[in-house]
Structure formats: structure tokens, C-alpha cells
Amino acid sequence: AYVGLDPDTAKADMMRAALEGVAFSIRQGMESFDAKPTEISLIGGGARENAWCQILADVLEHPIEVFANADILPAVAMASLVFNVPDLLQSVCECTVYQPNPDTARTYADAYRRFLSLYPMLRTMD
């Protein structure tokens, strides 16, 4: 559900809000883990979208690694295990790291708290 729409809400605002909602859901899921992740990697089609990668970094308040040649990751991971070279992935694969922007992360932290309070109410709507 979209909350807070007004006549000035543009299509781009709604698209961004959809991405933010997914990012908030990912954060909610990650908060259920027993331990915080040390690394977060993103692969697939969404990893090609800079805005999505940055939204994730800001919402999760954690760097996001994006590997340019993700298709070889399984083979590199296997070789890393077989040859006992733990840092092989970092030395073989080109990686872009999206760092959280502290100001944006604070804004998203406030929005995430609102998301957590609204989500239970909206979830019951049919």
C-alpha cells in the first residue's frame, strides 16, 4: 500500500517508494537473524541499478558489494574452497561497493520505524 500520496506525487516517487518498501522488508528479515552479516553481496538484474544498490546500502546501513561478473561466482567460490584460498573472490572478481550515506541512512531509519508501525495495520487489509 502507498501511504501519504498527494496530487504532487509523481510516478518516479511511487517507483522509488516500491523499492524502499522492498528494502525495508529485507531489513526486517535481516533483523531476525541471530548475527549481523559481515558482508552483503547483490547479484542479478537489480544489481545493475545504481539507485537500487544505494537504497539497499542506506536502508540496511551496511556496505553492499556488487560483482561485475557474477556468472563466475559459483566457480570462484568452489575453487576458493578446493584450493583453500579464502580471498580468491576479492582478487578475481571486479567489485563495486556501495557505502551507506550517513544522512540518507538516518532519514531511512526514521522511515523504517514508520514502516514497522504501519505494516501490521496494512497487512490485515484485503
Regions found by a protein language model. Name each.
Residues 1-126:
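Glycine/Thr-rich phosphate-binding loops that ligate phosphate moieties of nucleotide
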